[in-house]
Regions:
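Alpha-helix capping/helix-boundary segments
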Residues: 9, 41, 84, 105, ...
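Conserved beta-strand segments of alpha/beta enzyme cores
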Residues: 34, 76, 115, 129-131
Length: 134
Protein backbone atom coordinates (compact mmCIF):
# COMPACT_ATOMS: atom_id res chain seq x y z
CA UNK A 1 0.00 0.00 0.00
CA UNK A 2 1.24 3.49 -0.83
CA UNK A 3 0.96 5.58 2.35
CA UNK A 4 1.12 9.36 2.14
CA UNK A 5 2.09 10.50 5.63
CA UNK A 6 0.33 13.55 6.99
CA UNK A 7 2.81 16.08 8.34
CA UNK A 8 2.39 15.21 12.02
CA UNK A 9 2.58 11.48 11.24
CA UNK A 10 5.91 12.04 9.47
CA UNK A 11 7.26 14.03 12.44
CA UNK A 12 6.04 11.43 14.94
CA UNK A 13 7.40 8.53 12.86
CA UNK A 14 10.79 10.24 12.64
CA UNK A 15 11.12 11.62 16.17
CA UNK A 16 8.37 10.36 18.49
CA UNK A 17 7.03 7.01 17.24
CA UNK A 18 5.39 6.41 20.62
CA UNK A 19 2.79 9.04 19.62
CA UNK A 20 1.59 6.88 16.71
CA UNK A 21 -1.39 4.61 17.17
CA UNK A 22 -0.57 0.90 17.12
CA UNK A 23 -2.17 0.66 13.70
CA UNK A 24 -0.20 3.60 12.29
CA UNK A 25 3.05 2.22 13.70
CA UNK A 26 2.36 -1.21 12.20
CA UNK A 27 1.54 0.37 8.82
CA UNK A 28 4.76 2.40 8.85
CA UNK A 29 6.83 -0.64 9.84
CA UNK A 30 5.28 -2.97 7.24
CA UNK A 31 7.91 -3.52 4.52
CA UNK A 32 5.14 -4.12 1.98
CA UNK A 33 4.01 -0.50 2.33
CA UNK A 34 5.61 2.41 0.50
CA UNK A 35 6.00 5.46 2.74
CA UNK A 36 5.75 8.85 1.08
CA UNK A 37 6.15 12.36 2.48
CA UNK A 38 5.07 15.32 0.42
CA UNK A 39 7.06 18.46 -0.23
CA UNK A 40 3.90 20.09 1.18
CA UNK A 41 4.70 18.56 4.58
CA UNK A 42 8.34 19.61 4.41
CA UNK A 43 7.19 23.14 3.64
CA UNK A 44 4.63 23.04 6.48
CA UNK A 45 7.25 21.83 8.99
CA UNK A 46 9.66 24.58 7.93
CA UNK A 47 7.04 27.34 8.18
CA UNK A 48 5.53 26.19 11.47
CA UNK A 49 8.96 25.52 12.98
CA UNK A 50 9.96 29.13 12.21
CA UNK A 51 6.69 30.33 13.75
CA UNK A 52 7.53 28.38 16.92
CA UNK A 53 4.55 26.01 16.75
CA UNK A 54 5.48 23.46 19.42
CA UNK A 55 4.16 20.43 17.55
CA UNK A 56 6.49 21.20 14.64
CA UNK A 57 9.67 22.03 16.50
CA UNK A 58 11.85 19.11 15.49
CA UNK A 59 14.99 18.15 17.40
CA UNK A 60 16.89 17.21 14.26
CA UNK A 61 17.58 19.84 11.58
CA UNK A 62 14.96 19.37 8.87
CA UNK A 63 17.40 18.53 6.07
CA UNK A 64 19.00 15.84 8.25
CA UNK A 65 15.60 14.51 9.32
CA UNK A 66 14.53 14.07 5.71
CA UNK A 67 17.84 12.50 4.73
CA UNK A 68 17.74 10.02 7.62
CA UNK A 69 14.13 9.03 6.88
CA UNK A 70 14.96 8.45 3.22
CA UNK A 71 17.98 6.32 4.15
CA UNK A 72 16.67 4.46 7.22
CA UNK A 73 13.00 4.00 6.33
CA UNK A 74 13.07 4.36 2.54
CA UNK A 75 10.63 7.29 2.72
CA UNK A 76 10.02 8.71 -0.75
CA UNK A 77 9.56 12.43 -1.41
CA UNK A 78 6.47 13.44 -3.40
CA UNK A 79 6.83 16.72 -5.32
CA UNK A 80 3.88 19.01 -5.94
CA UNK A 81 2.63 18.67 -9.51
CA UNK A 82 0.10 20.80 -11.37
CA UNK A 83 -2.29 17.81 -11.36
CA UNK A 84 -2.28 17.91 -7.56
CA UNK A 85 -3.11 21.61 -7.48
CA UNK A 86 -5.83 21.26 -10.13
CA UNK A 87 -7.43 18.41 -8.17
CA UNK A 88 -8.21 20.93 -5.41
CA UNK A 89 -11.10 22.25 -7.49
CA UNK A 90 -12.92 18.94 -6.99
CA UNK A 91 -12.56 18.88 -3.20
CA UNK A 92 -15.46 20.05 -1.07
CA UNK A 93 -14.70 23.18 0.96
CA UNK A 94 -15.78 22.74 4.56
CA UNK A 95 -16.04 25.87 6.74
CA UNK A 96 -14.43 24.00 9.64
CA UNK A 97 -11.50 22.64 7.61
CA UNK A 98 -9.76 25.12 5.33
CA UNK A 99 -6.14 24.19 6.07
CA UNK A 100 -4.33 24.61 2.72
CA UNK A 101 -1.64 22.07 3.65
CA UNK A 102 -4.26 19.41 4.49
CA UNK A 103 -6.25 20.14 1.35
CA UNK A 104 -3.21 19.76 -0.89
CA UNK A 105 -2.21 16.52 0.85
CA UNK A 106 -5.73 15.16 0.29
CA UNK A 107 -5.55 16.15 -3.39
CA UNK A 108 -2.16 14.49 -3.73
CA UNK A 109 -3.44 11.27 -2.15
CA UNK A 110 -6.36 11.20 -4.59
CA UNK A 111 -4.22 11.86 -7.68
CA UNK A 112 -1.49 9.43 -6.60
CA UNK A 113 -3.90 6.68 -5.53
CA UNK A 114 -2.36 6.73 -2.06
CA UNK A 115 -3.87 6.16 1.35
CA UNK A 116 -3.47 9.21 3.59
CA UNK A 117 -2.27 8.31 7.08
CA UNK A 118 -3.45 11.02 9.48
CA UNK A 119 -4.55 11.40 13.08
CA UNK A 120 -6.17 14.77 12.29
CA UNK A 121 -9.77 14.68 13.52
CA UNK A 122 -10.76 17.41 11.04
CA UNK A 123 -9.76 15.19 8.13
CA UNK A 124 -11.69 12.24 9.52
CA UNK A 125 -14.74 14.34 10.42
CA UNK A 126 -15.48 15.33 6.83
CA UNK A 127 -16.21 13.29 3.75
CA UNK A 128 -13.30 13.49 1.34
CA UNK A 129 -12.94 11.14 -1.63
CA UNK A 130 -9.76 9.57 -0.23
CA UNK A 131 -8.93 6.59 1.96
CA UNK A 132 -7.95 7.90 5.39
CA UNK A 133 -6.38 5.76 8.09
CA UNK A 134 -5.36 6.62 11.65
Amino acid sequence: MKLLLDTHIFVWWAEEPEKLSRRALALCQDPDNTLVVSVVSIWEIQIKHQLGKAEYVVATPLNELIKSQREQNDVAILPVESTHVLALQNLPMYPTHKDPFDRLLIAQAIVEGATLLSADDKMHKHSYPVTLLR
